[in-house]
Amino acid sequence: MFNKLIKLFVILGLFYQTPVYSKSASFNEFNSRDLSNYFSGIIAFENKDNSDALKFFNASKVLLNKHDAYLKRYSFSLVLENKVAQAINVIKNSSNNENLDFFEAYLLLIADSLKKNNLNQAEKYLNLSLQFQNENRFNFVIYETLRQYLYTFKNKKTLFNKKNFGNISIINQAFLRCYLKKENTRSSFLNLINNPDGDYSRYIFFYINYLIENNQIEEAKAVTDQLEYISSTLLLSQSKSWVDGKKFKEFGKIFSCNNHNDIVSEFLFLISNLYSSQEDIEKSNFYLNLSNYLNPKFILNSSLVAENFYLNGEYDKAKKILSIFDKKYEFYYWFRLKKEAQIIIKDKGYEEGIDYLSSKFSKIKNPNEKIVFDVANFYKNSKNYEKAIEYYTKIISSLDDNSEIKSDLLYRRGGSYERLGDYQKADEDLKYSLKINPDDAYVLNYLAYSWLERDYKIDQAMEMLEKAYALRSNDPYITDSIGWAYYLIENYIEAEKYIKKAVELMPEDPTVNDHYGDILWKLNRNIQARYFWNYVLSLDDADEDIKKNINIKIIEGLHNS
């Protein structure tokens, strides 16, 4: 908060020292109440408290046509509160709406024009936004993509001279071919879905949608038959459920390639995801709400809004969004219950959260395997390993012996047995998992680490760890494991090399820093060792057992050193 206040004082100084700023030559013409509300709005806006920011901005509307920075913050706050139409009206009614000084203002006006099917006006606003295309790396991509889209919507053909943005261009090509009903639409979606350079599984939904829209039901069924509920995303699980239940009309209710607004909406959703992946929650929600404005039918996309609010600690807002997912959307309803349980855990602790989820789970008739899987994971995370094993076993018994999903479930159940100290069953599950998938680095790591801790089959454990590290050399947990393995066989120089890398990869992990302290002690670097042990005590994630052991080590050092 102190830093925010300092930032505000700097802003105030700039306002009063600069002779010409924005549309207002001086702040003397504004009364103190307007300025107070405006600057309170800035503080709230900077602190990500958008609801309060909007209240303060609403109370200082006199600045609307006199100060550009106010217009930007006010319109942003409106969009973030999902008042997109109001934000558009504010911009349209500003005294100089053809000389706006921020890119997103023109995006709002373009969205308004698209909603009104006024493609010429949308193109005009897009051209005006050209001045901002180099402000950041996304603006140019957005500008060029919208230019291609508008050309296609107007002329019913694709633009010949267009920029190539790699995989984003492949996505755009698939949607534009779908819009134009091109014969090669199918191959475009398949090329996208099977692209080895990333996870494009979301677009399986749009491929299924395309097949159903063109009455190719059997092909749509063939696609969903290849999907597994456990390993599929929310959207694909819901899609499979609709196809399995012959609810084909549900697809057209939320998206159509024939609707240009739906296509632009999906592009904006992609941009929202890109911002979310960079932890820019504000920009992510801005583009997501703009996406929802263009296609309000696709309410399933709101799961990202809920997730963003949850990650930002805005739990009341998250719960409000989650409430739209009712039992009609089976998998999104379950997502809602899980997220509500996670919020309860944050507020009241794990026990109350798991009790809430268990009570909701008990009311679900014939829960599918994905729901059972999630419940098992909740129990495992809450250290109720007996219950976790019970639910993992229910799913494992129904799966084919060679299923990769079975391999993952055996890994999870084996880990639960290991935590209970039932090493025989743990080893059986973990070795069976490796029989199905011998190159799973995480199973190799888990089994090998367990053996090392038990002083069991040390040479074989080292071989497995070396294989795991070769497969995942930048994974901090695997790096820590192989470093700790060298520690256990008293090769402290090699151990230090790996654990140091693990600390660099995961600097706030209590176990890794504790391990590094132990190794430094063995290397007679005692002052540094105590530094890392003390650092672990300051970490919120350090459990009481680690803290207890470290307090002893700080005083006595490592025994038998």
Name what the model sees in each region.
Residues Q17-Y74, L80, I88-N89, L100-D101, ...:
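N-terminal leader/linker segments that initiate helical-solenoid repeat arrays
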Residues I42, F76, A111, Y149, ...:
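Residue-level recognition of tetratricopeptide repeat
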Residues E46, L80, K115, F153, ...:
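Register position in tetratricopeptide repeats
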Residues L54, N58, V84-N97, L119-Q133, ...:
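Alpha-helical repeat scaffolds
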Residues N65, N99-L100, N134, N164, ...:
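Short coil turns that delineate tetratricopeptide repeat
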Residues Y70-L71, A105, N139, S169, ...:
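TPR alpha-solenoid repeat register
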Residues R73, L108, L146, N172, ...:
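Canonical tetratricopeptide repeat
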Residues F255-S265, P510, H515, K522-S561:
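Terminal, low-structured helical/coil segments at or just beyond the last alpha-helical repeat
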